[in-house]
Amino acid sequence: MPVTLSFGNRHNYEINHSRLARLMSPDKEEALYMGVWDRFKDCFRTHKKQEVLEVLYTLIHGCERENQAELNVDITGMEKIHAFTQLKEYANPSQQDRFVMRFDMNQTQVLFEIDGKVIDKCNLHRLLNVSENCIFKVMEEDEEELFLKICIKYGEKISRYPELLEGFANKLKDAVNEDDDVKDEVYKLMRSGEDRKMECVEWNGTLTEEEKNKLRCLQMGSFNITTQFFKIGYWELEGEVLFDMVHPTLSYLLQAYKPSLSSDLIETNTMLFSDVLNKDYDDYQNNKREIDAILRRIYRSHNNTLFISEKSSCRNMLI
């Protein structure tokens, strides 16, 4: 059954599943491909299909930019996620629930479905620019949702501001990480009871060396009050405060993701994921009871927050 789209000055334009799958491709030639018979029929159409598809392609993917090979980046996955989201938005409201983007059972692929049928997919290792031997921790459903929202924002930034891909794409991550919509979503998941624009609270506590060592896994093996709690979420429940660490896959996506294919970067990304982010997460979970007890004392003695500064310096805003 075709999907009905409305875009530009086109209304109720019907497109089948195979064409929607093609339109998700950032490769313009592939996206706009028409067979011999289709091209022949286009000669007799009042409104040329080729022209309509070009308009839709531009709306989805943005203006043409330099070849990805020249920029030495791999952003195909992010572009597909953005394209699928755009196609869903152009679909008539009554048909938008036919579009579903989700993870597979093993959380190694993002699947794009229409009417329950997979029309395309992207590999998570390639999407995050890490090697195939990189191990991902299992995400909960709400973490999956946040992951996809962040990826949609990456795709949006790439489409609107292709200049962010220049210079090894170093500015792309910052553009997403500093986006207000992304910050709001991260806080909604991990610090739902806290106003992210609140004033920080000055450090007024003391910690033993043993306690400091326990907290090192919160900050990649180091300890500094001004940055120690930026990966820790918390929320109140029935008079108790609960803590958790931002999932390592989300931390990587927000803090470290770079699509550049420059020499050794994939290996470096993989080492960061495995040897730092996953390790910190495991260390926290394995010592959660003792660490949470320390965090609870700090939280309660600092006006129920870990947004703590020292000598007016603070980097403890969540991620």
UniProtKB/Swiss-Prot annotation:
InterPro entries: SopD (IPR022747). Keywords: Host cell membrane, Host membrane, Membrane, Secreted, Virulence. Induction: Transcription is induced inside host cells and is dependent on the SsrA/SsrB and PhoP/PhoQ two-component systems. Highly expressed in host macrophages and when grown in an acidic environment. Changing F44R: Localizes throughout the cytosol and not to late endocytic compartments. The keyword Thylakoid does not apply. Signal peptide: none annotated. Changing W37P: Localizes throughout the cytosol and not to late endocytic compartments. One of its GO terms (biological process) is protein secretion by the type III secretion system. It is found in: Secreted; Host cell membrane. A motif (Required to target late endocytic compartments) lies at residues 37-44. Its main location: secreted. Disruption phenotype: Mutation leads to a prolonged survival of infected mice. Deletion blocks Sifs formation at an intermediate stage, before fusion of late endosome compartments with the SCV, and impairs bacterial replication in mouse macrophages but not in human epithelial cells. The keyword Transferase does not apply. One of its GO terms (cellular component) is host cell membrane. The N-terminal domain mediates secretion by SPI-2 T3SS and targeting of late endocytic compartments in host cells. Effector proteins function to alter host cell physiology and promote bacterial survival in host tissues. Contributes to the formation of Salmonella-induced filaments (Sifs) in infected epithelial cells and to replication in macrophages. Belongs to the SopD family. This is Secreted effector protein sopD2. It comes from Salmonella typhimurium (strain LT2 / SGSC1412 / ATCC 700720). The lineage of its organism: Bacteria, Pseudomonadati, Pseudomonadota, Gammaproteobacteria, Enterobacterales. The gene is sopD2.
